[in-house]
């Protein structure tokens, strides 16, 4: 099996297991419905898993959510070890995913410059339908 393919499969499986573990985590401060693990990146030696977290809320709430998850990373690592057949379960590190926020800012800048990609796409589709 291609090593890159295996790594991608492991990352995907870890992401699914983390979502399951999140539902079992008992922390009243954590708003589970608004937390999403957007991506998981395994290190080459598979000892570390960097997990990027998306969260709807204020910047303070997002920072607090990442801190709560980092405090519970032992719980997540144990859950992965019990459910995934690996020699060593990777150490989990949670980070705030700023990709969505950055894409919204880029979109806002484009709109300010007079270019709205969404409207242009709709306009092109309408033009194709008229032809």
Swiss-Prot record:
Any GO MF annotation of the entry: ribosomal small subunit binding
Gene3D superfamilies to which the protein is assigned, alphabetical: 3.30.300.20
Keyword vocabulary terms for this entry: Cytoplasm, Ribosome biogenesis
InterPro entries on file: KH_dom-like_a/b, RbfA, RbfA_dom_sf, Ribosome-bd_factorA_CS
Keyword Cytoplasm: yes
Function: One of several proteins that assist in the late maturation steps of the functional core of the 30S ribosomal subunit. Associates with free 30S ribosomal subunits (but not with 30S subunits that are part of 70S ribosomes or polysomes). Required for efficient processing of 16S rRNA. May interact with the 5'-terminal helix region of 16S rRNA.
Assembly mode: Monomer. Binds 30S ribosomal subunits, but not 50S ribosomal subunits or 70S ribosomes.
Protein name, entry field: Ribosome-binding factor A
Organism of origin: Thermotoga maritima (strain ATCC 43589 / DSM 3109 / JCM 10099 / NBRC 100826 / MSB8)
């Amino acid at each position: 099996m291609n090593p890159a393919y295996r790594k991608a499969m492991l990352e995907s499986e870890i992401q699914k297991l983390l979502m399951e573990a999140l539902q079992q985590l008992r922390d009243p401060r954590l708003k589970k419905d608004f937390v999403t693990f957007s991506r998981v990146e395994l290190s080459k030696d598979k000892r570390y898993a960097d997990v990027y977290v998306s969260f709807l809320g204020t910047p303070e709430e997002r920072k607090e959510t990442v801190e709560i998850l980092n405090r519970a990373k032992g719980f997540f690592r144990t859950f992965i070890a019990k459910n995934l057949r690996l020699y060593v379960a990777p150490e989990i590190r949670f980070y705030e995913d700023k990709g969505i926020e950055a894409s919204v800012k880029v979109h806002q800048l484009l709109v300010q410059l007079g270019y709205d990609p969404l409207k242009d796409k709709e306009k092109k589709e309408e033009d194709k339908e008229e032809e």
